[in-house]
Every structure is written in structure tokens, then in C-alpha cells.
């Protein structure tokens, strides 16, 4: 037998799903046979007579065999003689109307029929309770959240046993949909506390709802607590990622790094967004080489696109990791994909640091040829330095003279020009002395 399933909640959205049960599973234990054989004795109710029982059993069989219209027709025939039926028999008739409409996914008619069941006074208390609770579930599935709460409160007013976790969860879901998060969180917390006290594992969708409620209440610390429990109990990739995000949001960068790194090692981080996030977290925490490695592997695996931006990220991370040599191929790949010369400029600067002056001069010239530079003066400075170290003093002076035209690098260029001119004279003097 299928059962009505509790509505599920996601991080930022709430959706309810209703799996339609078979004709007689909505209200547990109530079939024509059970109603006839085991009438509730907690209150005086009239008997379900054999004649009515057989007619209801026929309608039930027709519906169970898949002929809902024939089942409804049989019930219509019974309804024509309702004046001769007692309250319990009428209630059972509407009960089966409700079942058939429910199986036909006609929730409004099902609700109307079940409301007629509980409107009859002389019915067993068990039928009254189960039907009222089912009405709350149906109202929830039908999107009538105020009515859901009203039915739950009606059920609570006649229920003499401890409230069930299903009561608190359904009420919490309705309040969530109504955006009354304070009442919603109180109810879901009660359901979870009750399960904890009984030594039971809270259902996963309860924690999902609790997390969503705290998020809506702007209580990130509570969201973290719930997600920590979800990771421990259910170990799903999305919970690890969400917990990492919330650690970042609450300023717990070390915990964020630890949880995301662990998720990565378990193979939970597979999407482009998640791998980029891990790379950025590594970089933020001073683990630049790991940042570059994650991005490089993501590109190789085809998860992250081999774009200029991503290659440049790897290259800059390598620079931060003091792996200048390893940055070169990534800057080169980035440069191949764009029309501007910014990445050739970075190549020139890295080559200078590596004392590869021929390559630095070539890269600087390529950057100037492509153009589109934000700081053109820096390229002329790099070119001037490369030419100086190659002892191309005149070319060096020309490059620094171009840099001098830019206010940003004017003073530095002037100093270099003076220095290069002195070195040129010194080199000429030395050559003359050696002749």
C-alpha cells in the first residue's frame, strides 16, 4: 500500500509531493471489512449493517479492480438510499467517495467527501481522528496551507494521545509555506526533539526543513549546526558543499577549508562551481599550489572550460606559490585565446624574474603589438629591463623613454634612464680599456 508522503523542502524552495495510495490506504486500517468486523467501541456508534456492507464492498472491489467510474456509480446508487442509512453507514459511504476521488487525483472532491465523513456525529473516534489528519495532508497537497493548520488543530482538539511527529512536521511545513518561520521552526524543532528523546533518528527531510527554516530566519549559526548533523547522519555531497558555504558565510574559513578539502578527497566535488569554490578557498588560505592543481585537474577532466580566465587563474596561483617557471605555460595558453596583450605582459614580467631576458623582451614586444593594455608603461619598463640585461643599452633607453611618458612610471623610468646611460658609458670605457 502506498501512503501520503510528507512534503519535502529544499534550501531555498519548498515543494510538496503526494504519492497517491490505493483506495483504502489513506486512512490506516479502515476498509469495508475492518469497519464491519471491528467497530470502535470508545463511543456509541450505530452498526454497519450487512446489506450496506455488501454494497460498499462491491463499490470497493470495482475501484480496486481499476474501474473508478463503476465504483462511483455503485456509491451513487447507495447514496440514493441514504435516508434509510445511519450516520456510520453514511460516513463510510463518503469515506469511499473520498478514496476514489483521491485515487483519481481529484483532491478538491476528495476533501469535500472526507469533510462529510467527519461531519457525521456518530462515527468511531478512530475514524474521526484518522480522517481529520488525512484532511490536513490533503489540504497541504492541494496548496491550502491555512486549512491544513485548521484541520491539524481540529485533530489536536479531539486527540487524547501524545502528539505525533507527523503532526509537528506537517504543521511546520504549512507554516513554512505561509512564511511564518517562527511558528514553523518551533514545530519542526519539537518533532526532532521528540525523535531524539525517543532514541530515533530524525528523518532527513525534517532536517532539510529545519535548515531551510533557520536560513529563512537569517540564523546562519543554526544553519551550520543543522548541516553538521546532516553531514554526520547522511553524508551526502550536497550537504558537505552547503556546510562549506555556510562556514565561509559565518567567517569560519579554516573549517570551510577542512570540510571542502575532505569533500574533494571523497569525490563529492564534481561540478564546475564547486571545484572553482575549492580553488578559491585554497588560494584564500594561502595554499596557492593546491588551488592551481585543483583547477588544472578540473580543466583536464573537462569539468571546467579551458578558458583564458581559468588558465590565468592557474598561472597567478603558481606565482603565489613561488612556482614562477610552472606559471609560464598557463600564461601562454591564456594569451593564445585573447586579442589583448595582458597575458604577454605577465609573461614578460615572469621571464624578468626568472632572468630569461630574451624571452622577456619577446613577450614585452608581443604585448605591445597586441595592445589593449591597462598599464602599458609597465610593459615598457619590463622591456627596458630586459634590454638592459642583454646589454642592448640604446634599446633599453628607448623603452624607458616610452615609459617616462606615463605619469605612473615617470619617476622610475627617469631613474632607469640615468642608470642605463651610466652603465653604457661604463661599458664603453671598459671596452676601450681592453683594446
Predicted regions and their residues:
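Alpha-helical adaptor scaffolds
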Residues: 308-322, 329-377
Amino acid at each position: 500500500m502506498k501512503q501520503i508522503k510528507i512534503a519535502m523542502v529544499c534550501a531555498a524552495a519548498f515543494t510538496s509531493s503526494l504519492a497517491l495510495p490505493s483506495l483504502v490506504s489513506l486512512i490506516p486500517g479502515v476498509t469495508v471489512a475492518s469497519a464491519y468486523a471491528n467497530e470502535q467501541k470508545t463511543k456509541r456508534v450505530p452498526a454497519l449493517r450487512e446489506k450496506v456492507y455488501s454494497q460498499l464492498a462491491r463499490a470497493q472491489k470495482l475501484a480496486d479492480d481499476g474501474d473508478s467510474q463503476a465504483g462511483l456509480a455503485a456509491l451513487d446508487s447507495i447514496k440514493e438510499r441514504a435516508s434509510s442509512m445511519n450516520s456510520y453507514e453514511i460516513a463510510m459511504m463518503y469515506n469511499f467517495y473520498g478514496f476514489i476521488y483521491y485515487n483519481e487525483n481529484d483532491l478538491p472532491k476528495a476533501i469535500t467527501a472526507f469533510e462529510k465523513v467527519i461531519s457525521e456525529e456518530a462515527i468511531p473516534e478512530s475514524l474521526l481522528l484518522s480522517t481529520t489528519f488525512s484532511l490536513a495532508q490533503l489540504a497541504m497537497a492541494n496548496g491550502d496551507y491555512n486549512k491544513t493548520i485548521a484541520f491539524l488543530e481540529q485533530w489536536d482538539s479531539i486527540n487524547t494521545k501524545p502528539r505525533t511527529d507527523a503532526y509537528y512536521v506537517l504543521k511546520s511545513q504549512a507554516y513554512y509555506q505561509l512564511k511564518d518561520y517562527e511558528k514553523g521552526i518551533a514545530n519542526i524543532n519539537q518533532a526532532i526533539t521528540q525523535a531524539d528523546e525517543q532514541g530515533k533518528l530524525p528523518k532527513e527531510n525534517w532536517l532539510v526543513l529545519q535548515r531551510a527554516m533557520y536560513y529563512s530566519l537569517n540564523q546562519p549559526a543554526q544553519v551550520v549546526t543543522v548541516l553538521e548533523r546532516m553531514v554526520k547522519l547522511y553524508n551526502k555531497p550536497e550537504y558537505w558543499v552547503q556546510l562549506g558555504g555556510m562556514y565561509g558565510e559565518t567567517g569560519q574559513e579554516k573549517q570551510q577549508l577542512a570540510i571542502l578539502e575532505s569533500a574533494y578527497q571523497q569525490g563529492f566535488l564534481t561540478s564546475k562551481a564547486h571545484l572553482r569554490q575549492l580553488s578559491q578557498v585554497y588560494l584564500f588560505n594561502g595554499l596557492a599550489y593546491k588551488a592551481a592543481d585543483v583547477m588544472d585537474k578540473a580543466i583536464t577532466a573537462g569539468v571546467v572550460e579551458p578558458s583564458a580566465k581559468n588558465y590565468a587563474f592557474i598561472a597567478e596561483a603558481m606565482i603565489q606559490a613561488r612556482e614562477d617557471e610552472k606559471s609560464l605555460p598557463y600564461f601562454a595558453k591564456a594569451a593564445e585565446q585573447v586579442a589583448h596583450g595582458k597575458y604577454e605582459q605577465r609573461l614578460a614580467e615572469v621571464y624578468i624574474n626568472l632572468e630569461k631576458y630574451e624571452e622577456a623582451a619577446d613577450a614585452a614586444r608581443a604585448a605591445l603589438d597586441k595592445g589593449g593594455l591597462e598599464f602599458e608603461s609597465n610593459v615598457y619598463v619590463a622591456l627596458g629591463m630586459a634590454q638592459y640585461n642583454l646589454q642592448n643599452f640604446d634599446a633599453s633607453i628607448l623603452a624607458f623613454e616610452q615609459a617616462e611618458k606615463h605619469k605612473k612610471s615617470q619617476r622610475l623610468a627617469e631613474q632607469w634612464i640615468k642608470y642605463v646611460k651610466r652603465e653604457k658609458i661604463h661599458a664603453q670605457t671598459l671596452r676601450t680599456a681592453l683594446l
